[in-house]
Every structure is written in C-alpha cells, then in structure tokens.
Amino acid sequence: MLNQKIQNPNPDELMIEVDLCYELDPYELKLDEMIEAEPEPEMIEGLPASDALTPADRYLELFEHVQSAKIFPDSKTFPDCAPKMDPLDILIRYRKVRRHRDFDLRKFVENHFWLPEVYSSEYVSDPQNSLKEHIDQLWPVLTREPQDHIPWSSLLALPQSYIVPGGRFSETYYWDSYFTMLGLAESGREDLLKCMADNFAWMIENYGHIPNGNRTYYLSRSQPPVFALMVELFEEDGVRGARRYLDHLKMEYAFWMDGAESLIPNQAYRHVVRMPDGSLLNRYWDDRDTPRDESWLEDVETAKHSGRPPNEVYRDLRAGAASGWDYSSRWLRDTGRLASIRTTQFIPIDLNAFLFKLESAIANISALKGEKETEALFRQKASARRDAVNRYLWDDENGIYRDYDWRREQLALFSAAAIVPLYVGMANHEQADRLANAVRSRLLTPGGILASEYETGEQWDKPNGWAPLQWMAIQGFKMYGDDLLGDEIARSWLKTVNQFYLEQHKLIEKYHIADGVPREGGGGEYPLQDGFGWTNGVVRRLIGLYGEP
C-alpha cells in the first residue's frame, strides 16, 4: 500500500462543472498517467469498517451546499458529523427535496446527521489544583477509545486508545502526539504511550504513512515526520524497543522520498525536490488540490483573492496544513496576504531536519540489528542531507538557518523552525552558538520564544509562542552546551503557562508572549482552543525537569 495517490474522480460522474483546466506546472514531474486509489483502511476486529471517502467525496453537492451556506460557524463541524443512515440514502433524499420551496438545509442536516461531541466542555477544572495536578487529571478527559468510532463518519478507527488535543480537535494528530507523549511519560502513563505507539505503527502498516490525523480528509497528507523521535522516546522510557519499528521507519521514509530517483535537477515530485547540484531535499505536500474539507469555505475565499489557478492555491494551503505551521509568514510571498501562499515552493528547514533524524534513526537501529549495508546507506543519506542543508538553508552571513525558496533560488524568512536542526543533532557547535545569538536577539521574550519575528495575523507568527517550539529550543540549545539559554526559555515558558493557569484555570493551544504579559494567542482560521494536548505534554515534562513554577 506504499505511496498510493488519490484517485481523481471523473467530474462528469460527480455532476460538477469544470470551468477551467490548467496545464501541468513544468517544474512538477508527472511520473505516469496511471490513476491509483487511496489506500483502503483495514478492518479492526469488533469495529465497523472505515473507508477512505472524505465527506466532500461522499456528499458531493450536499457538502458544498452546507459549507457555502455556513450553517455552522466552524467549517470543521460538518465534516466531523456522522450520518444517521446510509450516506447514499441521505444524498438521494437531498436531491429529491433540495428544490422544494420550504426546504430548510439546517433542519435537513440536523435530521440526518449526528453532530460531533465536544467532550472537554463537560470538564470543569478545580482551581485548587496545582499545574501538575491539573495536567495529570486531564489525560482521561482527552483520551478516546476505539469504540468511539461511528459507521460512515470521517473518523478513522484505530486499534488502541489515543489522546486528542482538545476543543474542536477530537481526533489524534501526528506531530502533536509526540509532544503530548513527553508529558504522558512524565505522568507515568506508559499504558497510553504503548497504545499510541501501536496506533502509529498500525497507521504506517495500513496507510503507508502516518496521516495528518485519523480523519479520512487527512489521508492525503502527513505532518512533520516525528515517528523516529517517538521511537526514541519509547526506547528511553522502556515502553517499546526501537528495533521493532525499523520496518515502520523505512516505510515512512519511502513515503517521503517517493519518486526521488526519477527526478532531474530543478524538478520536484510530491515531497521531493532535486536541487540544481543534484542533491535531494524535501518539501511539504498534499496529494489533493481541492479545498480542505475542514476549511472548505475559507479555502475557496482565499483562492478567489489570489489571482492564481485555484487548484494551485488549494495545494499550497493543504501543504501548509501538512507543515503543522498553518499558517505562517514562512509560506507567504506577501506576509500580509494568505492568498500569496506558496508552501510547495519552499524547502523547510524543520522538515529536512526531521528527515535527517529519520535517516539517522534507520542507520542506528540497522546497526543494532547487524544490517550493515542498510546502516551504511542511511548514514550516507543523512550526511548528504546535512551537506545539502548547509549549502542551501544555512545563512552564514547572519548565522541562522532559513527556509529556501527553490523556485526563486533564494533564502526565505527566519523563524523558530531554525532550532530543529539543534534538536535532532544536525548542526555543528559553531552553527549552534551563532543561532543562539540570533534567537536571543530576535525571538526571545520574557515569555519564551516567538514563532517568528513577523506580525502577519497568522497564528504561527509574532506575537505567539507554541509549546513544541519551546521544547525543541530548550533541549536543542542544552544539547550543544548552552544551558543558560535553554534554562531561560524553560523557566520563561513555565512562568507564562502557570501565570495564565492561575488566572484562567486552563492550558491553551498557544500564548501571546510578545510583551511579557501572558494571554491568549490569536490569529488563524479558528478560535483559540483549550485543553491542550501538546501544551500539557511539554509543560508536564518541564515540571519534571525544573519543578513547579
């Protein structure tokens, strides 16, 4: 099931008008004309079978009607609804009654669908609890069980229990989960760690990759590839031995490198770009180029204001979601306009650092298993990637890593993503020292480190600080001997989260940290979410290292 693409349905079959056809971008390699189906989910004993149809695929014009009418304030609500009967029967009924004078779309949806539950709204925190106690008591609230799956819903069944971030996010997310796991380990929840380890391995086995999240509409993309970091955590905490995951790591690597060998310089296919000197680097990608199910109306509106073919904009919006940084000045040609997004034209520093970690992990585990040829091959791949990153993504003049615009052949903006090479051990000590100086002068605040130094209104920019960036910066700088900076970031972040907790009795997705007065972070396509998985995980781990703030 490796590396299968999305099947492109015939527009005539879907009864959708196609007004415009755009030629293939000359930079993008089309390897063949063969249509391949998206991988079908496997059966899980005792649970109804999932399928790969997204709500947009399944409900066609009904889906577009609901999303364009905005009968729910959040575009994610309808894709997360579950049908009360066979979806085909619902679509047939809709087609029969939609033109009736008294047709009420909202009532039709309410009569035919179960609305998604917001579990965390039932939880009321105890103001007397310490931050540590609050987090430990939240794990059961954020846990979902396999039997929670409903037939024909967009939720993909998983074999074991899992943690969700909270709020509108009622499914597990790939890269979020790694940072959540840090806290689970600190809380002694090895039971949940084992469940999540099994779930992610199961997804790789059955989908060929780990999707963005366990929803059908997330199958066409992944997220930052942190499974190698998860495996390292499992090994360190005695949850699972690393050797058992070697094949899974190789499968994930094959997903990210699909098509690489067929590329010529200055050409790209899916996640891979062949650079002018022949080296290989990676970018974020999504196999679909349609509006995202969960942000359908927002994507349509963004494309309208772009002046570009809509399918290009949709692809870049989807690739931005795959990056985990949705959205940020990192992906914008004009930092004031989301419509200028060009995610697929950037070589991201964090993605290539995570893939360096993946290559290194495969080499290290292969060595443990005595597979010398595989070890040598992947050590060479990791070394080649490090060299390519240093050639294209290292700004020697300013002493920082930056993303690289491979279409324009120039360095892009500086952001906190630059700390990931330190976290995975890809930088040398001189680079780490110079980067530390840049972070101190450009990103460090009394509340932690900013996502970027640009104010754009996007959530992964100034004035916001995010838990995963703090963790990777803390550990990354300490790994290279800069305990002073690492400890300063840690204590600043703990102070931010604790001060907000004492006032609001909750942890949230992101924090406004630009001026030393912690408050709710803003920006983005949806209201601020509380819960919150990865904030809980990072803070719980930091409490274990530094004590209660």
Swiss-Prot record:
Regulation: Activity decreases with increasing salt concentrations.
SUPFAM superfamilies (alphabetical): Six-hairpin glycosidases
A single cellular component GO annotation: cytoplasm
E.C. code: 3.2.1.28
GO molecular function ontology, one term from the record: alpha,alpha-trehalase activity
Coiled coil, from the record: none
Record protein name field: Cytoplasmic trehalase
Species in which this protein is naturally found: Escherichia coli (strain K12)
